[in-house]
């Protein structure tokens, strides 16, 4: 395939990007998890189509130095797909990795698992795409015209089809086991890994046993207004005596959030100069917009904390964490994508098959 610049193609892409690109979304959103009709047979790309010359994913990530960078000149990466959005815990993105590193590709559509199979080789022409960062995680996307984020999604099919090329099918990537000492090493960020024998809960440097629920007084308001709009929950507020009311699920669907909210367990959480209870209407309902909420459940690996973040739109959002894990009588091992958020270890499950007992058998 000739990768020389096609002037008309680039002009068309520029026009489309100005008209169609949306900014990156900070939160998880609904994900189509059904099945599309089988597409027509497509061309399968091979190394020969690209002259057999590739930039490693590690070298691509090194292009980022404290600011987003638009890739210029010939730059093609090649990697295997390591994620699936079938259960809804990833949003408009997939991860690929080669022998050097892994990276998130921000493809702006749902149902990616129907098009990009686990283990399939993917080629990405990075020319004119942008390498950016989100709270410590380097990703590849399009330039965000609003400058609110460092990258946005490849929203239009024409743009996707001229940058992302499907290669041959292969066996799924095998996860690498990562130790506590390697949790925050750059080489492991964005890769499919397994971490073993974690205990539920994590006491931070302030002595708080962490659980993190991200919710908003106004879901349509400023989601970066942490003082007046965001609801953060840890055990600095009193845990209810009735343990059944505590947040013991991987995330919260909209229905589950309402169940928790109307139980009253969040009433004393401080927000916007008051408490959640202050946002009740005269009839006793809460004046808080309804949406699904992501939850980070904290676990301890050795002496390190790992937050396992799950989407309220995931099929397993309302699935309870095993009782033996919650009460500390059993440990848990995870397989999924290792990331970080503001310097702390964060983990994304692909599905509940990635949640194992100490002996390697499934919890679910």
Where are these regions (language model features)?
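Positively charged n-region of N-terminal signal peptides that target proteins for export
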Residues: 2-11
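C-terminal motif of bacterial Sec signal peptides marking the signal peptidase cleavage site
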Residues: 21-24
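N-terminal leader/targeting segments
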Residues: 1-3, 18-19
């Amino acid at each position: 395939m000739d990768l020389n610049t096609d002037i008309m193609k680039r002009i068309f892409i520029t026009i489309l990007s100005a008209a169609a690109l949306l900014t990156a979304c900070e939160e998880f959103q609904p994900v189509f998890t059904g099945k599309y009709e089988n597409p027509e047979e497509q061309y399968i790309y091979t190394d020969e189509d690209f002259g057999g010359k590739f930039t490693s994913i590690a070298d691509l990530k090194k292009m980022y130095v404290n600011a987003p960078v638009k890739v210029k000149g010939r730059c093609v990466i090649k990697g295997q797909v390591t994620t699936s959005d079938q259960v809804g815990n990833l949003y408009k993105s997939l991860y690929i990795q080669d022998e050097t590193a892994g990276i998130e590709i921000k493809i702006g559509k749902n149902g990616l698992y129907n098009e990009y199979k686990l283990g399939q080789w993917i080629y990405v022409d990075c020319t004119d795409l942008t390498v950016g960062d989100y709270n410590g995680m380097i990703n590849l996307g399009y330039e965000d015209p609003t400058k609110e984020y460092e990258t946005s999604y490849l929203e239009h099919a024409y743009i996707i089809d001229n940058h992302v090329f499907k290669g041959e099918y292969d066996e799924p990537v095998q996860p690498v086991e990562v130790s506590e000492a390697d949790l925050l090493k750059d080489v492991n960020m964005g890769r499919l890994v397994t971490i073993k024998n974690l205990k539920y809960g994590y006491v931070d440097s302030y002595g708080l046993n962490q659980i993190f629920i991200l919710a908003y007084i106004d879901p349509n308001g400023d989601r970066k207004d942490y003082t007046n709009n965001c609801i953060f929950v840890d055990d600095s507020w009193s845990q209810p005596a009735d343990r059944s009311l505590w947040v013991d699920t991987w995330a919260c669907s909209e229905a589950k959030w309402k169940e928790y909210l109307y139980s009253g367990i969040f009433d004393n959480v401080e927000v916007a100069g008051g408490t959640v209870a202050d946002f009740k209407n005269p009839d006793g309902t809460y004046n808080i917009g309804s949406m699904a909420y992501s939850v980070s459940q904290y676990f301890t690996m050795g002496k390190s904390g790992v937050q396992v973040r799950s989407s309220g739109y995931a099929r397993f959002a309302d699935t309870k964490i095993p009782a033996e894990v919650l009460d500390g009588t059993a440990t848990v091992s995870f397989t999924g994508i290792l990331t970080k958020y503001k310097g702390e270890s964060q983990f994304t499950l692909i599905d509940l098959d990635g949640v194992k007992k100490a002996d390697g058998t499934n919890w679910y």
